[in-house]
A protein has these predicted regions:
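Short, charged recognition helix plus adjacent turn
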Residues: 2, 62, 72-93
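Short alpha-helical DNA-recognition segment
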Residues: 19-44
Length: 93
């Protein structure tokens, strides 16, 4: 069985680190914004161990002062080509 992970963990870590925030400080800022979390929750997000719902994405973006789409990794043309070829392969008769 394939394990799925959230895609934004590494980007959240980079954005948090760029602001000079510890996981504890980031968790406190998220709590002030209304999100129920703690340092352990931030750690799990960054380690890609938990799925994130829309509300969580909005809290993260709000506190980090970025657009939600900036939380997701950038995809290059190679990724899109690979996706296209994978879809093409699965639709062959």
């Amino acid at each position: 069985m394939k394990t799925f992970k959230n895609n934004i963990g590494p980007q959240v870590r980079r954005l948090r680190y760029a602001r000079g925030w510890s996981q504890s400080i980031f968790a406190a800022k998220l709590q002030i914004a209304g999100m129920e979390t703690d340092r352990s929750g931030v750690s799990k997000i960054e380690a890609r161990l938990i799925f994130l719902d829309d509300r969580t994405l909005m809290y993260l973006a709000e506190v980090l002062k970025v657009e939600v789409q900036e939380l997701f990794p950038k995809r290059d043309r190679t990724d899109r080509l690979h996706d296209f070829l994978s879809r093409l392969e699965t639709t062959r008769f």
